[in-house]
């Protein structure tokens, strides 16, 4: 049952998605009623957080069992003795899952209100406290120590510093103010610390602020799956083409036992800095970062210098991950998607430029994994159909592990080809929520199965380069 309204789109984007979910291939096989029901279910799921928090253990520094024990103790402390299990994923040996409790519908709302920006609100729904930069408005006389109710401005209409807000807002839970209104909106400049400590969130997830920072990395479940599918081996040379903020980069290095070379590129300097910070935090030494545009990463001719960075010569890498820039429609939670249709459709040509470079940089016999965190055909299955037609040297490969669904019909791919693709579709799970009683009555196998479905929307394709055609 929905707690929040369905995700909203601009009208032209809504029409685009509706047409996509009513394509002839889908309607012929499933019927228009089934596809309409599935589409509406997806819209509801996207506005709610995933049912589990996924944590990747840095097995370079600690064992899963050890971190699981420490994490269980930390959660008990945060939840004041409430017993929420920490589950080991049977097919992802470095991954822990924590069920999310919620939505909690019976929370009392307080007179003192705090309005936060949409992105801050989404972080709160996944376990974060409220930090000052995310606060847009507070009640006029709010003091440090006040009990407050926190709301998200999902349409981006609230002006910073407002004393009240009458626009569309969504209740996120209750907290205690760490600062007064005057301190938050001080003219001496914005603060960066915690503004509201959440004590009764609508969705109860652990906060990971400074919790085992060397041993844990928060990732969405499909993002962990991607690195396992690429399956890098010690001593290999790997390219992560669009690497920020470094979750997959550091995972690849960990899977290689920090032996070999992982080249991580991003074209934004601040994002490259974040990759470096994460590599240092997790104590990984085989990662080399470069601020560079992936579409220009192929060297036209051999260079005189011995520089190890981009551009690179053809066939320089054993394996390549292209986690491509995308429209991001699979991210959860998201209650109001603001991009225009022009912005949504701009990603396909960019992805093809990056993909073309990736194919040329990949050695014969090498593996290329392409992934996105979106739900559109144009950025996923259509890209696979284009790639197979454009590059005869590429063949689709089975994925291990394969815990998501198959590819979506509508791009002209065969059933055998669709089975080789992995599409994580949040609507595959029932939007039911979880309370502590139902959690304690659940079998671990059932919880794992639910976690495999109740995650973000995501797509993965795996290719092998067979020859130099």
Q: Each predicted region: which residue ranges?
A:
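C-terminal catalytic and target-recognition region of SAM-dependent MTase-like enzymes
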Residues: 70, 78, 84-85, 89, ...
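S-adenosyl-L-methionine
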Residues: 265-315
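Glycine-rich nucleotide cofactor-binding entry segment
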Residues: 2-246, 250-255, 269, 273, ...
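A mobile, often basic/glycine-rich helix-loop segment
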Residues: 2-9, 50-52, 331-349
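Short beta-strand element of Class I
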Residues: 259-263
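Glycine-rich S-adenosyl-L-methionine
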Residues: 267-274, 337-363
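The conserved SAM/SAH-binding core of class I Rossmann-like methyltransferase domains
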Residues: 151, 239-241, 265, 290, ...
């Amino acid at each position: 049952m929905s707690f929040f309204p369905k995700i909203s789109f601009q009208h032209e984007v809504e029409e685009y998605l509706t047409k996509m979910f009513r394509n002839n291939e889908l309607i012929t096989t499933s019927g228009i009623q089934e596809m309409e029901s599935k589409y509406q279910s997806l819209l509801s799921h996207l506005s709610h957080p995933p049912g589990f928090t996924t944590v990747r253990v840095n097995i370079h520094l600690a064992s899963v069992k050890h971190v699981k024990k420490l994490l269980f103790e930390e959660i008990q402390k945060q939840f004041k003795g409430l017993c929420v299990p920490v589950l080991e994923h049977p097919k992802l040996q470095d991954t822990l899952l924590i069920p999310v409790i919620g939505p909690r519908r019976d929370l009392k709302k307080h007179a003192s209100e705090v309005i936060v920006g949409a992105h801050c609100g989404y972080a709160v729904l996944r376990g974060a406290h409220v930090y000052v930069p995310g606060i847009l408005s507070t009640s006029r006389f709010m003091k440090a120590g006040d009990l407050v109710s926190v709301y998200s401005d999902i349409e981006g209409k609230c002006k910073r510093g407002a004393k009240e807000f009458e626009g569309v807002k969504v209740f996120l839970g209750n907290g205690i103010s760490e600062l007064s209104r005057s301190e938050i909106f001080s003219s001496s400049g914005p603060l960066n610390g915690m503004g509201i400590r959440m004590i009764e969130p609508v969705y109860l997830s652990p906060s990971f602020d400074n919790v085992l920072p060397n041993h844990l990395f928060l990732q969405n479940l499909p993002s962990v799956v991607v690195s396992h599918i690429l399956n890098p081996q010690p001593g290999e040379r790997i390219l992560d083409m669009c690497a920020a903020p470094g979750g997959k980069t550091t995972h690849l290095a960990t899977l290689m036992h920090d032996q070999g070379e992982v080249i991580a590129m991003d074209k934004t300097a601040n994002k490259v800095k974040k990759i470096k910070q994460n590599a240092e935090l997790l104590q990984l030494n085989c990662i080399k970062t470069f601020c560079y545009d992936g579409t220009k990463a192929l060297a036209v001719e051999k260079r005189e210098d011995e520089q190890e960075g981009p551009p690179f010569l053809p066939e320089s890498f054993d394996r390549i991950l292209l986690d491509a820039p995308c429209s991001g429609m699979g991210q959860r939670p998201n209650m109001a998607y603001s991009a225009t249709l022009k912005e949504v459709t701009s990603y396909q040509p960019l992805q093809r430029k990056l993909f073309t470079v990736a194919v040329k940089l990949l050695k014969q016999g090498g593996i290329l994994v392409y992934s996105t965190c979106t739900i559109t055909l144009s950025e996923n299955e259509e890209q696979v159909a284009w790639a197979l037609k454009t590059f005869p040297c590429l063949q689709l490969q089975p994925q291990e592990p394969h815990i998501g669904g198959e590819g979506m019909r509508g791009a002209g791919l065969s059933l055998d080809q669709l089975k080789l693709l992995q599409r994580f579709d949040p609507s595959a799970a029932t939007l039911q929520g979880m309370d502590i009683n139902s959690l304690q009555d659940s079998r671990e196998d059932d919880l794992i199965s639910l976690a495999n479905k109740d995650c973000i929307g995501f797509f993965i394709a795996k290719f092998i380069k067979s020859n130099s055609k």
